From Swiss-Prot:
EC number: 4.2.1.19
Descriptive protein name: Imidazoleglycerol-phosphate dehydratase
Biological process terms in GO annotation: L-histidine biosynthetic process
Alphabetized InterPro entries for the sequence: IGPD_sf, ImidazoleglycerolP_deHydtase, ImidazoleglycerP_deHydtase_CS, Ribosomal_Su5_D2-typ_SF
Main enzyme class: lyase
Molecular function as annotated in GO: imidazoleglycerol-phosphate dehydratase activity
Pfam families tied to this protein: IGPD
Keyword Amino-acid biosynthesis part of the UniProt annotation: yes
Localization (cell): Cytoplasm
Gene3D superfamilies in the record: Imidazole glycerol phosphate dehydratase, domain 1
PANTHER family per the UniProt record, alphabetical: IMIDAZOLEGLYCEROL-PHOSPHATE DEHYDRATASE, IMIDAZOLEGLYCEROL-PHOSPHATE DEHYDRATASE HIS7
UniProt KW keywords: Amino-acid biosynthesis, Cytoplasm, Histidine biosynthesis, Lyase
Catalysis: reaction(s): D-erythro-1-(imidazol-4-yl)glycerol 3-phosphate = 3-(imidazol-4-yl)-2-oxopropyl phosphate + H2O
Length: 196
């Protein structure tokens, strides 16, 4: 199979985001978004998905972290889409149940080229290390739309914001890694239509 890599850069009046992605990596990450907790989450996502990920983001953090977080999701999603190519010879779907202390999260996804997010997460409002809790949903919506992923995220239990968010990011990485696995038993796309 060909190299599944991408480099995407996006610049607006609010942000400048650069993402380099290797879907067949070892889980290494170099992330600098200016939001320490968000960096930690993206590093965890990469580690649990065995992705090599580089993210460099400059944003209007003096205003709010919203633009930086959402735009990172947009560019990361675009990088996934580009690196996937025609989505041939992969498992396509991935599902994981991931615990972190009292938090238990399920993430199920389909690299279907049909973007859709179901966010069934009741997380205590507030901030974690400069990261507004509600921005996790916006990040994953942006990833889903840009990458063409049907994505379901469900929280079964949890009280600690940090634990809940970390379980979500790790769970997404794990489910994505499973969906990206190559399957030598077929060469085309896993679809009765023959295309995604």
């Amino acid at each position: 199979m060909e190299m599944r890599e991408a480099y995407i850069e996006r610049q607006t009046k609010e942000t400048r985001i650069r993402v380099k992605l290797n879907l067949d990596g070892a889980g290494t990450a170099q992330v600098d978004t200016g939001i320490g907790f968000f960096d930690h989450m993206l590093e965890a996502l990469a580690r649990f998905g065995y992705l090599d990920l580089e993210v460099a983001a400059e944003g209007d953090l003096q205003v709010d972290p919203h633009h930086t977080i959402e735009d990172c999701g947009l560019v990361f999603g675009q990088a996934i889409r580009e690196a996937l190519g025609e989505r041939r010879g992969i498992e396509r779907v991935g599902d994981t149940l991931l615990p972190m202390d009292e938090a238990l999260v399920q993430v199920a996804l389909d690299l279907s080229n049909r973007p859709y997010l179901v966010w069934d997460v009741e997380c205590p409002e507030g901030m974690v290390g400069g990261f507004p809790v509600e921005m996790a949903e916006e990040f994953f919506r942006a990833v889903s739309v840009q990458a063409g992923i049907t994505l379901h995220i469900r929280l079964f239990s949890g009280k600690n914001r940090h634990h809940i968010l970390e379980a979500i990011f790790k769970g997404f990485g794990r489910a994505l890694g499973l969906a990206l696995r190559e399957n030598p038993r077929f060469q085309g796309v896993l679809s009765t239509k023959g295309v995604l």
